[in-house]
Design a protein with these regions (language model features):
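Auxiliary, metal-adjacent structural segments of Zn-dependent hydrolase domains
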Residues: 175-240, 244, 248
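Active-site recognition of the HExxH zinc-binding catalytic motif
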Residues: 64, 253-272, 276-277
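Post-HExxH zinc-binding segment in Zn-dependent metallohydrolases
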Residues: 156-158, 163, 266-313
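Membrane-interfacial, low-structure loops and terminal tails that flank and connect transmembrane helices
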Residues: 1-13, 89-110
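Pan-zinc metallopeptidase signature
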Residues: 329-406
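Membrane-interface segments at or immediately adjacent to transmembrane helices
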Residues: 132-203
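Internal/C-terminal transmembrane anchor helices
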Residues: 104-135
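Membrane-embedded alpha-helical segments of integral membrane proteins
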Residues: 26-92
Length: 406
């Protein structure tokens, strides 16, 4: 084969590479445009997403560690290497031009950049189909969930009383040792309780059907702890990870929250709502206790805010205290709840203290970065932020009341 034929064949090969990228880019652009239709997004999550999630989650569940976390680290290193190499290569070419020397072509650099481009396209593809389209749909996949109706004081009080009773009863039902401390099961048993509850809710929310992989403790749990992050679901590998220093009591609500993301409910209000709902409706007494503790204080705050808005600070607080007195027999033992919560946090702190943390000197920097991240997430999420989970919780129980069920 002559030199000219080799060159022509090489050009054809490059042309094929470009054509494939262009074709993939066009398909991506079409679905990106479709993603701005919430009806399409809901259809996609209900019909296509479960197939993708089932396959991808099964593949990465094979690994005993969080592959998504490792990929994230490799991605960060690759980005740094790419930036440094590109800057050095650019300076080198500029110097040769200034000296009026022909710039040498780097086959290695060009090949590397082609690979990087393919990787970038793959990630854009996965984030579009694994996260962006599900995230853009209606809240809970239901247009009605976005109506955001207001609730009266009486309605808040109804749900508050309902959860108070569950909270009180679950305090008595949880297994305790001779010192009155809660006896927690291992993570496998606890997660089985989470899965059962999520699957029980699948009649109401069909997206919760299907395959559930095993949550994995994050290697960077200490960093997550400094940043105030309990867990993260990796969209590209469909893996649930959690901060291993999370308290055993809160762990149930956290994993239910992350599992909701795992099933396509990616908005934070959806995750917050599903975390509380799955917990309070669980058949596991510790999980019920965890969910009631979480939702009880959110509902108390919502009820108090409604009273203050209507009657002013002083009178509103007086009425709230009056409600507490009138419903005293329905109320949980808040001192016991506080002790249980502190016991769980102390155990988590002991686990943290038992491990080495070589990056601990950067904990303040991580916390500052987290503050920026939380503020940014709140601005982007807007009305779909965590605090809207209480409104969805109210929607559910008021809907159940209207149907004559609890």
């Amino acid at each position: 084969m002559s030199e000219g034929e080799k060159k022509e064949k090489k050009e054809r090969r490059l042309s094929l590479y470009a054509k494939i990228l262009i074709a993939v880019g066009c398909v991506w652009a079409v679905f990106f445009a479709l993603s701005f239709s919430k009806s399409f997004d809901d259809w996609y999550v209900n019909n296509i997403f479960p197939l993708i999630q089932g396959v991808v989650a099964r593949i990465f569940n094979i690994f005993p560690f969080a592959a998504g976390e490792i990929i994230m680290y490799l991605g960060a290193v690759t980005l740094i290497v790419t930036i440094i190499w590109s800057v050095v290569f650019g300076i080198f070419k500029l110097v040769r031009r200034i000296r009026r020397k022909s710039a040498k072509k780097s086959r290695i650099y060009r090949t590397y950049m082609k690979v990087i481009l393919v990787i970038a396209v793959c990630f854009l593809w996965m984030y579009l189909f694994h996260w962006w389209i599900p995230y853009n749909g209606h809240v809970m996949g239901e247009p009605a969930a976005e109506e955001r109706r207001g609730y009266t004081i009486e309605e808040y009080r109804y749900v508050w009383r309902l959860i108070s009773v569950k909270f009180r009863d679950s305090q008595k039902a949880v297994p305790r040792d001779e010192n009155g401390r809660i006896i927690y099961p291992d993570k496998k048993t606890a997660y089985e309780a989470v899965i059962r509850s999520m699957k029980n809710l699948s009649e109401r929310y069909p997206r919760l059907k299907g395959y559930y992989g095993t949550p994995k403790a994050a290697k960077c749990s200490d960093v997550l702890d400094w940043m105030g992050i309990g867990g993260y679901t990796y969209p590209y590998t469909m893996e649930i990870t959690y901060n291993k220093y999370t308290s055993d009591l809160y762990w149930y609500v956290l994993i239910a929250h992350e599992t909701a993301h795992y099933k396509g409910f990616y908005k934070e209000n959806e995750g917050e709502f599903m975390g509380m709902l799955a917990a309070v409706l669980s058949d596991d007494p510790i999980m019920v206790y965890a969910g009631c503790e979480d939702s009880y204080y959110f509902l108390s705050a919502a009820l108090m805010n409604a009273l203050v808005d209507q009657y002013g600070m002083k009178e509103g607080l007086q009425i709230f205290r009056q409600f507490m007195q009138e419903d005293a027999e329905l109320m949980p033992d808040e001192d016991l709840a506080y002790r249980d919560e502190m016991d769980a946090y102390e155990a988590a702190e002991e686990a943290y203290a038992a491990d080495s943390h070589p990056l601990e000197q950067y904990s303040d920097t991580a916390a500052e970065a987290a503050d920026v991240g939380w503020d940014t997430q709140e601005a982007v999420s807007a009305e779909n932020y965590y605090d809207d989970g209480t409104r969805l919780f109210m929607d559910y129980f008021m809907g159940e009341k209207a149907k004559g069920t609890k």
